[in-house]
Amino acid sequence: MAADDHFSLFGLPARFDIDAQALERAWRAVAAQVHPDRYATASPAERRVAMQWSARANEAYRQLRDPLLRARYLCEQAGVDLQTESNTAMDPAFLMQQMQWREMLDEARDDAAVFAELDAELSDARRQMRETLATLLDERHDYAAAGQKVREWMFVEKLAQELAAARPAG
């Protein structure tokens, strides 16, 4: 078994907008081929290789089934260094939106209505980012712009996690 990347491992086109059911079917087929139980009577070297392929298939599936991780993977495969730790440069309008969301998060801890409003705004932001990334990655092949959008989406996901942890009582 040989595969240069996660998509070719599953026989899928390298696209952001993928068929989730086709991914699941392909993963199940690959996982069945390399499952360590199939190699129980094989040599230690063959068992080790099967375990490595199984781990690789599981990691590839984990990354491809999550839209944000899939977008990040596509950008990295295209040579875009996302520099998520050091590159904090973002669109000024997004930075302003970030500040507004942070203020709402502080209020949402004690106010169920603000919580619901912020939750809805973050859901809408995720949907918009998915649509934008589908265009940037699959149609325009603008990986640099997609990388910027991925960094923004990562912020939105982090904020959504903080919001979930701050759910007001009652």
Swiss-Prot record:
Gene3D superfamilies: DnaJ domain, HscB, C-terminal domain. GO terms for cellular component: iron-sulfur cluster transfer complex. The keyword Chaperone applies. Keywords: Chaperone. It comes from the Bacteria. It holds the Pfam family HSCB_C. SUPFAM superfamilies: Chaperone J-domain, HSC20 (HSCB), C-terminal oligomerisation domain. One of its GO terms (molecular function) is ATPase activator activity. GO terms for biological process: [2Fe-2S] cluster assembly; protein complex oligomerization; protein folding. Residues 5-79 form the J domain. Co-chaperone involved in the maturation of iron-sulfur cluster-containing proteins. Seems to help targeting proteins to be folded toward HscA. Interacts with HscA and stimulates its ATPase activity. Belongs to the HscB family. This is Co-chaperone protein HscB homolog. It comes from Bordetella petrii (strain ATCC BAA-461 / DSM 12804 / CCUG 43448).
